């Protein structure tokens, strides 16, 4: 196996498959294509932006048999998994248990490790076992339904209800009234509001603070700390309205001081990785720590077993190191030997969405990129900073690019200051148009004077 890695590095001939079709997938394409080790990129299923870096394949991220056929026919060396669903469904195990696939590097944990994201109850119990700071909680299901009602009725307000399983980012409800909380609890467990994901409910103490996202790449023992980010989930300006997949993100996070980040490392990151080792959970991939800062102390809101979207669009913009080399070091268990280089500049991404999102919306609308010469991407990385138009819900139709999702584009900028990066992204978005296009103009508002 060691000889295989030496051969890969020497010949620089990695064929890489990226799973995903969102802005995160496009960002991975952009970053990985810069590596001297990458000679060919494939993306399943991809979008109009990813096709500029490699070959899009019309395959679902959870169609493991079709992914297997592609990996064999294209002689894939490395699979980068974007979304959580294939990880929770066991794509890592699928590869490692197959003699034709087990030589391929897969970025992600085993199905057991992916339960950190796939089950809120599993994650909370894991944190409790390893003394990782998090909100107090209890869990209930159909059998303990009445007990849960009594618990919620007497719970201090606000109270947080979380569907145990994956619910497309919509499985968390913050309730300010007991009647509201009991109604939501009934909807989740008895009326199957979130389907299978809501068979179990985590009832959690509400923590009042400010949120941020912290990312590491781990080999199950060592790790490298990637740039932190803050995302904006609410659809409307002023952080109002329903939650979305993310309307924008910034990095670095001004309130994440060195002192605070040292607490994150000591109290959250290292106990998590130590816990994975102690419980013999296979985990080689990204860990996304959803944190909240309360009185200068970090608490874990959630784990995710992959990179975030739109956070990836700012995190990788600031990562100057070769991502592919880091992924090889991950597979070899040598991340402790790696020192990554982070750009000191600030990054901001703002997401353009379809009218009606996160509810119903139209697809198939033509995108007008205005004066931008290249509609797929802007490659203007220079001494003043850089601009990237990362595609998410887009599709190539002849000579046109059309909308194909709720979140359509993520315009990301790198500049000397956060206000400058935010303004740069807004200036570019002002040149782009499609019917009903909307974006928040207040991304990073807390940090702009």
Locate predicted features.
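Active-site nucleotide/adenylate-binding loops and adjacent lid/helix of ATP-dependent enzymes
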Residues: 17-18, 103, 116-202, 254-270
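Active-site "cap" helix and flanking loop/linker of ATP-utilizing ligase/carboxylase catalytic domains
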Residues: 265-287, 304-382
């Amino acid at each position: 196996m060691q000889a295989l890695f030496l051969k890969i590095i020497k010949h620089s001939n990695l064929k890489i498959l990226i799973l995903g079709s969102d802005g995160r997938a496009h960002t991975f394409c952009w970053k990985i294509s810069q590596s001297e080790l990458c000679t060919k990129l494939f993306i399943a299923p991809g979008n109009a932006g990813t096709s500029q870096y490699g070959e899009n394949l019309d395959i679902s991220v959870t169609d493991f048999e079709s992914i297997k056929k592609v990996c064999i026919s294209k002689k894939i060396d490395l699979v980068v998994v974007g979304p959580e669903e294939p990880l929770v469904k066991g794509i890592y195990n699928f590869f490692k248990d197959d003699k034709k696939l087990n030589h391929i590097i897969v970025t992600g944990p085993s199905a057991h490790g992916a339960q950190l994201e796939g089950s809120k109850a599993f994650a909370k119990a894991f944190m409790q076992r390893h003394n990782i700071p998090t909100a107090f909680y209890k869990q209930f299901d159909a059998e303990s339904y009445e007990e849960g009602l009594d618990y919620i009725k007497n719970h201090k307000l606000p109270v947080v209800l979380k569907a145990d399983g994956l619910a497309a980012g919509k499985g968390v409800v913050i309730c300010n009234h007991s009647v509201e909380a009991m109604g939501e609890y009934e909807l989740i467990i008895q009326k199957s509001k979130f389907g299978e994901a809501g068979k179990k409910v985590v009832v959690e103490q509400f923590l009042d603070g400010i949120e941020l996202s912290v990312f590491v790449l781990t080999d199950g023992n060592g790790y490298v700390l990637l740039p932190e980010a803050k995302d904006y989930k609410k659809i409307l300006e002023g952080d109002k309205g329903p939650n979305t997949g993310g309307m924008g993100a910034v990095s670095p996070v001004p309130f994440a001081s060195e002192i605070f980040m040292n607490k994150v490392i000591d109290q959250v990151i290292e106990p998590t990785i130590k816990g994975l080792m102690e419980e013999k959970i296979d985990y080689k991939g990204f860990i996304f720590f959803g944190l909240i800062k309360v009185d200068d102390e970090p608490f874990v809101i959630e784990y995710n077993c992959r990179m975030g979207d739109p956070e990836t669009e700012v995190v990788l913009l600031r990562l100057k190191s070769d991502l592919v080399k880091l992924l090889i070091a991950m597979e070899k268990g040598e991340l402790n030997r790696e020192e990554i280089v982070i750009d000191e500049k600030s990054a901001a991404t703002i997401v353009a969405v379809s009218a009606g999102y996160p509810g119903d919306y139209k697809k198939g609308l033509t995108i007008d990129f205005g004066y931008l010469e290249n509609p797929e991407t802007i490659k203007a990385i220079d001494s003043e900073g850089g601009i990237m138009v990362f595609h998410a819900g887009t599709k190539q139709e002849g000579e046109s690019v059309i909308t194909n999702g709720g979140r359509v584009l993520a315009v990301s900028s790198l500049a000397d200051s956060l206000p400058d990066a935010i303004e740069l992204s807004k200036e570019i978005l002002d040149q782009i148009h499609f019917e009903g296009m909307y974006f928040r103009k207040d991304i990073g508002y807390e940090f702009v004077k």
